């Protein structure tokens, strides 16, 4: 999203931009963290969506500490009926996945939780000796090295098996890059899987979206979550 320009600022709210003023209240936002604040112009009282000194909180830790920086959380179910949750700080703001849009007397903050990441399932689980050699022959030395670390040959069958334990972090990225560099496609992956009696199904990305609208109305701050802004995969129903 485009950076939000400050209409005004206040020394009591460093890092925050004033975006709406209705004569009684002023609305501020930090466009990096999406936290908002409301200043009552008559009393000087400030209300914040998140604690001001949360970084120095000594009680909260882990995900609870992150929740001090979040504005919302989504609970959802997986295919086993187990409930998990994502929050707007850990799963959206921390990855720069927010968009801001000015509305009448306020602002709309749109969050995307999660991202479409490629992983181990985007690499063939098994490759015949011929197919392995065909692919490796097209790769540069870095790609060939990645393959040697990511696949091991079954001496009896000659088949190369993916070493799942090795495919994490940088090694996973290097191996994905090696396949990308030779133009390896999802169709190639489906074909290579089929050759060994394996079915390939692209994993469903666990991506959610939600918007929060903040606006001033007389003496009040109105906070709205438009139902139409809530999006989630069918496989992960939201509670």
Model-derived features with residue positions:
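Long, leucine/valine-rich, helix-dominated scaffolding and oligomerization segments
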Residues: 102-109, 201, 208, 223-226
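Short linear interaction motifs
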Residues: 8-9, 89-93, 190-210, 215, ...
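Intrinsically disordered, low-complexity segments enriched in small residues
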Residues: 2-3, 177-190, 198-201
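Acidic (Asp/Glu-rich), glycine- and aromatic
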Residues: 203, 224-239
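Short alpha-helical segments and helix-capping/turn motifs at coil-helix boundaries
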Residues: 13, 22-24, 93-95, 207-211, ...
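Short beta-strand segments that buttress and anchor functional surface loops
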Residues: 109-115, 194-202, 227
């Amino acid at each position: 999203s485009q950076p939000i320009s400050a209409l005004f600022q206040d020394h009591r709210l460093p890092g925050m931009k004033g975006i709406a003023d209705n004569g009684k209240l002023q609305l501020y936002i930090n466009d990096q963290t999406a936290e908002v604040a409301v200043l009552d112009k008559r009393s000087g009282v400030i209300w914040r969506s998140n604690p001001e000194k949360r970084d120095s909180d000594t009680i909260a830790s882990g995900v609870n500490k992150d929740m001090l920086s979040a504005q919302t959380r989504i609970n959802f179910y997986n295919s086993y009926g187990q409930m998990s949750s994502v929050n707007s700080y850990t799963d959206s703001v921390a990855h720069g996945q927010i968009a801001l849009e000015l509305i009448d007397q306020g602002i709309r903050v749109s969050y995307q939780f999660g991202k479409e990441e490629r992983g181990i399932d985007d690499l063939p689980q098994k490759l015949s000796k011929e197919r392995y050699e065909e692919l490796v022959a097209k790769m540069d030395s870095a790609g060939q090295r990645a393959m040697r670390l990511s696949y091991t040959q079954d001496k009896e069958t000659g088949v190369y098996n993916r070493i799942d334990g090795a495919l994490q972090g940088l090694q996973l990225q290097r191996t994905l890059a090696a396949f990308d560099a030779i133009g390896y496609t999802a169709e190639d992956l489906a074909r290579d899987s089929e050759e060994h009696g394996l079915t390939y199904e692209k994993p469903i990305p666990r991506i959610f979206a939600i918007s929060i609208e903040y606006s001033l109305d007389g003496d009040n701050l109105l906070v709205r979550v438009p139902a139409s802004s809530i999006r989630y995969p069918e496989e992960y129903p939201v509670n």
